[in-house]
């Protein structure tokens, strides 16, 4: 598959696809991935990890035109994975049985998906997570969880794009303007331009991507409908 500068591809997939949750998926992963997989205590978490990383490798193989098992990943200083010797940027996120993979060319990208769920102390969570403008939007809403999780996916996506980690002061990352201005590139910090957009996913979930720079073209794909991969 071809990807040009300014384009972004979002792949959606289901992590409970029976064909992928099995021991046969393990040989596709690297030694580092298998080591990480074995650190999970629950078998279901191990299988979810294997399934997710197989999806990521199979989709990326379509763009790199090499076997999925031959893709070499490395980690940035803060743990964000990247592909060695490639101008492709990618990021993935999964919750419950759903996942997203974002792919761009020469532009950093972040993506996040979250399951909407009740919070024990929404006021305290918001106080440490959102700016004053974001909180104003959240608490003016009839259903506070809807904008709250929208903003949380915005934050996760931009944090993953920048690779700064959740230990950053999230209240200083004000993304309130993006709530009403989807796809309009806005300045976030240091005069850098970012594009943030909600992704429509299954009911009960929220998702978003963040792209550094302008977005010229945006496409979504369903992994479960795509049958050709460079697996071996």
Say what each PLM segment does.
Residues 1-232:
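Core catalytic alpha/beta fold that binds nucleotide/phospho-ligands
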């Amino acid at each position: 598959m071809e990807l040009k500068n300014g384009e972004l591809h979002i792949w959606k997939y289901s992590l409970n696809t029976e064909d992928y949750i099995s021991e046969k998926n393990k040989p596709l992963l690297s030694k580092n991935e298998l080591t990480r997989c074995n650190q999970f205590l629950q078998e279901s978490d191990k299988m979810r990890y294997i399934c997710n990383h197989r999806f990521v490798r199979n989709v990326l193989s379509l763009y790199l035109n090499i076997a999925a098992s031959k893709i070499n990943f490395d980690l940035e200083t803060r743990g964000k994975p990247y592909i060695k010797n490639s101008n492709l940027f990618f990021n993935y996120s999964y919750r419950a049985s759903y996942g997203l993979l974002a792919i761009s060319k020469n532009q950093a990208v972040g993506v996040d998906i979250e399951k909407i769920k009740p919070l024990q102390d929404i006021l305290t969570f918001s106080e440490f997570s959102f700016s004053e403008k974001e909180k104003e939007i959240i608490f003016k809403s009839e259903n506070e969880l809807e904008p709250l999780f929208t903003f949380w996916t915005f934050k996760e996506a931009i944090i993953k794009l920048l690779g700064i980690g959740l230990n950053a002061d999230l209240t200083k990352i004000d993304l309130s303007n993006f709530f009403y201005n989807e796809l309009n590139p806005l300045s976030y910090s240091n005069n850098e331009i970012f594009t943030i957009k909600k992704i429509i996913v299954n009911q009960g979930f929220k998702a978003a991507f963040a792209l550094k720079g302008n977005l010229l073209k945006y496409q979504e794909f369903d992994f479960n409908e795509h049958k050709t991969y460079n697996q071996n």
